[in-house]
Every structure is written in C-alpha cells, then in structure tokens.
C-alpha cells in the first residue's frame, strides 16, 4: 500500500477508488482512478496511461499470496467487517432500515446486503474469496467509462481493457432485469430497545417493475414528497404537526420500492 500511495502521489495526487454496492438484483463493483489531464503535467507525463494501468491492475491483478488473496489481509478485513456489523446495532437509524429491507425483500437477491451478514463473516476463507473473484471476472458484464480524455486516449484505454479480457475465458451472464416485490397486506414488525428516540422505517412497492419512462416523474415526486427541506413530509409532518424529529423518503428504481425513514417519540 505504501508503494501505491507513493505512485498516486507522483501522479499529482491521483485518487484510486474501489466501491461495491447492490443495484437491484445485481451487485456493482466500480474501480476508478481520477486525476488531472495529460496537458497539465509539468513534465509532459502520459498520465492517462498511468491511470489506466493502475485501474486495470487493481481490477485484474490483485495481490495474491500462493495463488489466493493474502490470508493476513483477509484476516484483517474480516475483523474490520465483523466489528462494523457488530457496531451497527448502535446506529439505530441504519439498523432499522436494514431490518426493514430484510423483511421487505425476503429471499429476493435484491435484499442481499452490501456488507453481507455477521453470521457469515467468520467462515470466509481466502480460497472462497479468490474463487468468487475469478467467477466475477468470467461472468460479469463490464462497462468502461472514460471522461475528459481525447478520442485517442480513450481508444488506448479501451484497447488495454480488451487486452486484459482476452486472457480470460469470458461467459458474461445476462443483466438482471428491474424487479418489484408483489403487493401484499401490510406487515408490521417491532423491536424494542432502551433508547430516547424511536426509529420508524416504512417500505412500499409499485407491485410491478418500473418502466424507464416513469423515472423522471418519480424523481420529481420524491423531491416533493420527502426528498428535500421543502418536501411535504418535512413541512407538514415535522414542521407543522411536530410528529417526528426527521422524516424523509427515497426511491430505488431497480426494485420499484420507496422507503420512508423517520425518528419519532416512542408514544407515536
């Protein structure tokens, strides 16, 4: 990591980011490098080529020990993940949302948590993670986004990616379609803790997969309903009626679902 940090510093403070998050029934892994354009390099360095090398290296050539992810590094990451999952109970707002999602999505792939589950962490091995990594390289759909570069630079980055893919026996799976949980009778679940402020999370479904032409209207509806300090929830439920400490809504197009989060008095 020290060598990588020095490398990024020499590239005028370039930034490497690796991020994973669920998107409906899919899991999205993003590897990106951000830095200044070649034209601003003081000594004419080919920065774009270096950025591509770092991003592709992180994606296709991770640090292995004996053919698997470094057991020591895996052990450290397991400890950190386990601690984060154990501490989640202390963030009742996040805990409430995760519990609601678990109830709402049930066994659907859309309900799989980004961080996984505490009971599964201890059993993870470097071999399992390595096998999952290679399966991802073989079956994942891959998109390349290049911003702020010339056509020639973009073509060079594309060729470098294709060269990496050529060495893999690829069999990409079809992209998962948007889903929606079926409509059903309301389900209520309550957990009791010794705390000053209670948390309320409500999830709603469209009942059918969201269509592309609906997206703009839904975004506007969310802003009006609970997505800003001028929304109906904020102005009426919080400011006028004083029924909560906070109240907001969000919408996920991949799953056709809306969430309303609020902090309330226990009596309410």
Predicted regions, residues:
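Charge-rich, well-structured scaffold segments of protease-associated domains
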Residues: 3-172, 239-268
